[in-house]
Regions:
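PLP-dependent aspartate aminotransferase-fold enzymes
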Residues: 1-41, 45-110, 114-179
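Conserved PLP-enzyme active-site core in the AAT-like
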Residues: 8, 14-20, 119-264
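PLP-dependent enzyme catalytic core of the Aspartate aminotransferase-like
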Residues: 208, 384-417
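Active-site C-terminal subdomain of aminotransferase-like
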Residues: 233-339
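Short beta-strand-to-loop capping motifs
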Residues: 260, 354-358, 394-396
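Conserved PLP-binding catalytic core of the aspartate aminotransferase-like
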Residues: 342-371
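Conserved PLP cofactor-binding pocket of PLP-dependent enzymes
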Residues: 346, 351, 374-391
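A common structural junction motif
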Residues: 371-379, 411-417
């Protein structure tokens, strides 16, 4: 359980990075085992590779990047330069901005190979850092996660039609070779509620050996609906999935989740603090929650979610989802029936983008502010390749057609003539 979709996305990136580090460390160990009896001089290409990686290293003292890389390369054990022992570089991702307090999003994850250390050690590997690849439609928290973890800025693929097209993702991935990748797809975009083509994106991620994360904070509850769950085909192929029931789950904040296929996927979060999860206590059966969250001090947010699931069940939530999706489609039909209004596109979830026919961006923004200032309606705004649109995000499963007509009447009444 997390504070919301933002923290879930950040946690997904953290797990992807830790998975990458572990894979790289395993490869390094295998190389050291293989080459331990056959010392060899570094080739020019190897030295150039280290220089490239060293450019990403955070320096300390007066060392140059090459000084640091060379010390890690030789394992700082007095090993002659010609020996391949101890390939190491400092992990740039282990350095992020500090935050006060105990309940923040930690940017220095504990490494489970040292389960009893009080502070997270720095992980080391010679490979390049994790590279995130996402669409321009991705939530801003994906970019923030890269910043928090000290990763390179995400490669952002244009999404002119609002979804991440497989051909565009393939072109981007083809230019990213020799580095670990995390492909991020979205199931319910912030602007329009659009859903990326998950099966095709999952195929591409697998073909390029990339991790696959789906941000389903908005659209994830379609899984409850027998009518609409097909829109999330391919979600089961993700390594991590973000869900947030404060959106289309009718929960007060916070109500976020990060879902993984297997509890063992959360192993990088393992941490030992004797006063919380001493070995003998956990062996005796006491619950250990440190490996299930980045936060130690947290509210019992799971309680309200558990009560809702218990009271409504799968069918009850599915009914609310279906009713709300139907209301959004009704609103879209009502917009199309009025010559004075234009619809951006048929809704996928419960977000409807529309505006007065022919209205420019200034007019759309003015209408929205007037409705808000007068206390008549709260509409969002969304900028697409075709300009600015009013955004109606429907979350009331009991909205009636007359309610929706009244909203459109208000928009028309506040449109400058």
């Amino acid at each position: 359980v997390t504070t919301g979709g933002t923290e879930s996305n950040q946690l997904a990136v953290l797990l992807a990075r830790e998975h990458t580090v572990r894979e790289q460390q395993a490869r390094e160990h295998a190389l050291r085992e293989r080459d331990s009896s056959t010392p060899a001089e570094h080739t020019p290409r190897e030295r150039e590779t280290v220089r490239e990686h060293a450019a990403r290293i955070h320096g300390t003292g007066h060392d140059t990047a090459w000084d640091q890389a060379h010390r890690h390369l030789t394992g700082q054990t007095g090993t002659p330069t010609g020996e391949r022992d101890g390939y190491r570089t400092r992990d740039r991702a282990a350095h992020g901005p500090d935050h006060p307090g105990r309940a923040h999003l930690h940017t220095h994850p504990h490494h489970p190979t040292h389960p009893h250390t009080p502070h997270p050690p720095q992980t080391g590997h010679t490979g390049p850092p994790l590279q995130i690849v996402c669409g321009a439609n991705a939530h801003h928290s994906i970019h923030r996660a890269a910043w928090l973890l000290g990763l390179p800025a995400p490669v952002t693929v244009p999404t002119p039609d609002g979804t991440l097209r497989p051909t565009d993702l393939a072109a981007a991935l083809d230019h990213l070779t020799g580095q670990p990748l995390l492909v991020v797809a979205t199931a319910g975009t912030t602007d329009a509620g659009a859903i990326d083509p998950l099966p095709a994106l999952a195929d591409l991620a697998a073909a390029h050996g990339a991790r696959f994360h789906v941000d389903a904070a908005y659209g994830g509850t379609l899984l409850f609906s027998d009518t609409h769950q097909h829109l999330l085909a391919g979600l089961d192929r993700a390594h991590t999935v973000t869900l947030d029931l404060h959106k289309l789950g009718w929960q007060p904040v916070a109500a976020g989740f990060l879902a993984v296929p297997d509890a063992r996927d959360l192993t990088p979060l393992d941490h030992r603090a004797d006063y919380l999860n001493a070995d003998d206590d956990t062996e005796a059966g006491l619950p250990d929650l440190l490996g299930r969250s980045l936060r130690t001090t947290r509210r019992p947010d799971i309680l309200k979610i558990a009560v809702t699931l218990k009271a409504l069940g799968r069918r009850g939530i599915a009914d609310l989802v279906d009713r709300t999706v139907t209301a959004a489609r009704t609103l879209a039909d009502l917009v199309e029936a009025r010559p004075t209004l234009e619809l951006h596109s048929p809704p996928t979830l419960t977000t409807v983008l529309f505006r007065p026919t022919g209205a420019d961006d200034t007019t759309v923004a003015t209408i929205r502010r007037r409705l808000l200032h007068d206390g008549r309606a709260v509409l969002g705004r969304a900028t697409t390749s075709t300009g600015l649109w009013l955004k109606a995000t429907l979350l009331n499963p009991h909205a009636r057609p007359d309610d929706l007509r009244s909203l459109l009447d208000l928009v028309e009444g506040h449109t400058p003539r």
